[in-house]
Curated annotation (Swiss-Prot):
Belongs to the universal ribosomal protein uS10 family. GO terms for biological process: translation. Pfam families: Ribosomal_S10. GO terms for molecular function: structural constituent of ribosome; tRNA binding. SMART domains: Ribosomal_S10 (SM01403). The keyword Metal-binding does not apply. Keywords: Ribonucleoprotein, Ribosomal protein. This is Small ribosomal subunit protein uS10. Involved in the binding of tRNA to the ribosomes. GO terms for cellular component: ribonucleoprotein complex; ribosome. It comes from Anaplasma phagocytophilum (strain HZ). Gene3D superfamilies: Ribosomal protein S10 domain. The keyword Iron does not apply. Part of the 30S ribosomal subunit. The lineage of its organism: Bacteria, Pseudomonadati, Pseudomonadota, Alphaproteobacteria, Rickettsiales.
Amino acid sequence: MVTQKIYIELKAFDHGLLDRSARNIVLVAKRSGAKVNGPIFFPRRTAKFIVNRSTHVDKKSREQFEIRTHKRLISLPKANSAILQALMSLQLPAGVDVKVKVVGG
């Protein structure tokens, strides 16, 4: 049985949804017998957009928008194929972007 190191990167705009998804991944990994590091919190990234309310005049009247992107990392240092299959069968919400990186094996 070959052991691999698995990194799971999660991104979302809603931090509550992101934390619930990270908790589900950690629960499934621990139930499968893996050692879990994380979730590791990354700094929140904020993008701000400022646009004029009017199309032609009144430069002083503007609308401000911002998007906050939250990010978490979960590391599984010694994972096997059974743990990877358990993680792949997990259903996550649509608002969470998941990237899985497998190192070794």
